[in-house]
UniProtKB/Swiss-Prot annotation:
Belongs to the universal ribosomal protein uL22 family. InterPro entries: Ribosomal_uL22 (IPR001063), Ribosomal_uL22_bac/chlpt-type (IPR005727), Ribosomal_uL22_bac/org-type (IPR047867), Ribosomal_uL22_CS (IPR018260), Ribosomal_uL22_sf (IPR036394). This is Large ribosomal subunit protein uL22. PROSITE patterns: RIBOSOMAL_L22 (PS00464). The gene is rplV. CDD domains: Ribosomal_L22. This protein binds specifically to 23S rRNA; its binding is stimulated by other ribosomal proteins, e.g. L4, L17, and L20. It is important during the early stages of 50S assembly. It makes multiple contacts with different domains of the 23S rRNA in the assembled 50S subunit and ribosome. The globular domain of the protein is located near the polypeptide exit tunnel on the outside of the subunit, while an extended beta-hairpin is found that lines the wall of the exit tunnel in the center of the 70S ribosome. The keyword Ribonucleoprotein applies. SUPFAM superfamilies: Ribosomal protein L22. Part of the 50S ribosomal subunit. It holds the Pfam family Ribosomal_L22.
Amino acid sequence: MEAKAVAKTIRIAPRKVRLVLDLIRGKSAGEAIAILKLKNKASSPVVEKLLMSALANAEHNYDMNTDELIVKEAYANEGPTLKRFRPRAQGRASAINKRTSHITIVVSDGKEEAKEA
């Protein structure tokens, strides 16, 4: 059984979020939370909050024991890009892309559910 949580349009570039997600993928929930609390990255608090949400979803929606859960999937896709311009010399302007992320975390208890035929 698995439960997931999704955060959309987070104002951190997906490349930076993936650095943190790579650290917690495959870890137990408790270990992942400990890693996120100690990691000094801008995306750590956001990912930690999302992981807590996934754990709460698992407990509330599926009556799963949060102590047994592992982070099965953790990925960040690109969200909409905010396009801005910075004035430059001689009347020119440079484009600035402010990237956003859609972050998804899936937690699982390791047990496969019976598939309906």
